[in-house]
A protein has these predicted regions:
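Non-catalytic C-terminal accessory region of glycerolipid acyltransferases
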Residues: 3, 13-54, 58-60, 167-312
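Helix-to-loop junction immediately C-terminal to a conserved catalytic motif
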Residues: 82-113
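A conditional alpha-helix N-cap/helix-loop micro-motif detector
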Residues: 91, 140, 163-167, 203
């Protein structure tokens, strides 16, 4: 079988995300400097930066009406309106790469998790492009005042972050994709604990989900990295002057080599293959973030379990 990326109109029938409880505290916003106007201008000379909440990088797109109708359009509209107000009052958001978003069919968005902006910016951007992914998010978010109910109405898939739940989470995620719906995940599982807010160690569930859903569909499910940077320095009590926030929606991963021989895997994706795909995602996220920040990424990565920097 040739493991090429799934065509945009694919539909179908039929490691671990891990229980990651909070550990330590994220570093304060003073730990990083704001994203400067000069750096945004430098990025704009290389990439086509757009307002992801209002602009279409390649012209207006045909919305996926089936997804929209299935995901409470009235609640979605209200949430987007609220997010738009917050984003515009607190920041100046730009993005590149949204032309990569498929108009139809399943795909996976693996997003960074520096701040809550890493939730809202990709969400609003994909909604504006006419897609309605399901979101894997910690179950506690459903209990948040006011917006918790909205999260459930607009596609949140609650994640019970307890031991023994990983397989169920992965199976639910695979079923979402094999039904033809897109899925968004945050592989770090919680806000990064890296003192300088680089991507940290990730659970290999994103690798399991991508590989298993591709095996069941018989084609490589498109997998994209969404990297957001700039919100870490925002003071939410007094956000002015507004800070720059930039998101990159990267081109699709090619992980066909990891699908070789998948018919002989048995009931589970080999751990080494899920680990390798997850590692590639982390490395790529770090490369993109380094470009957005205009900085050299530190060697290695921050390990959540040991709360220290380790070698790759």
């Amino acid at each position: 079988m040739s493991w090429k990326a799934a065509p945009s109109n694919v539909s179908a029938g039929g490691g671990t995300m891990g229980a990651m409880a909070s550990k330590g505290k994220p570093s304060p916003r003073s730990a990083v400097k704001p994203l400067s106007d000069e750096q945004v201008a430098k990025l704009a000379r290389k990439h086509h930066l757009v307002d992801p909440t209002h602009d279409f990088p390649t012209g207006p797109r045909k919305a996926n009406t089936a997804e929209i109708e299935a995901q409470n359009p009235k609640a979605t509209h209200r949430l987007l309106a609220g997010c738009d107000v917050v984003l515009r009052n607190h920041s100046k958001v730009k993005a590149w790469g949204l032309e990569h978003v498929p108009e139809t069919g399943p795909f996976i968005t693996a997003a960074t998790h520096v701040t809550m902006y890493d939730v809202f910016v990709p969400m609003v951007s994909l909604f504006h492009q006419g897609r309605r992914p399901r979101y894997m998010a910690k179950a506690e978010m459903a209990k948040w005042p006011l917006i918790g109910k909205w999260f459930q109405l607009v596609g949140m898939q609650p994640v019970q972050r307890r031991a023994g739940k990983a397989k169920a989470i992965e199976e639910t995620s695979v079923e979402i994709l094999t039904s033809g719906r897109p899925l968004t995940v945050w592989p770090e599982g919680t806000v990064t604990r890296d003192p300088q807010k680089w991507p940290m160690s990730m659970k290999n569930g994103v690798g399991v989900i991508a590989l298993e859903s591709s095996r069941r569909l018989g084609c490589q499910v498109p997998l994209y990295c969404a990297v957001t940077w700039g919100a870490a320095s925002i003071n939410h009590w007094w956000p002015w002057p507004r800070k720059n926030v930039v998101m990159c929606y990267d081109e699709a991963f090619d992980y066909a080599d990891l699908l070789d021989g998948c018919d002989s895997w048995g009931d589970e994706v080999p751990t080494d293959r899920a680990d390798e795909l997850t590692r590639r995602i982390r490395v790529r996220m770090t490369e993109i973030m380094a470009e957005i920040r205009g900085e050299q990424a530190p060697d290695g990565y921050w390990d959540y379990r040991t709360m220290s920097r380790v070698k790759d």
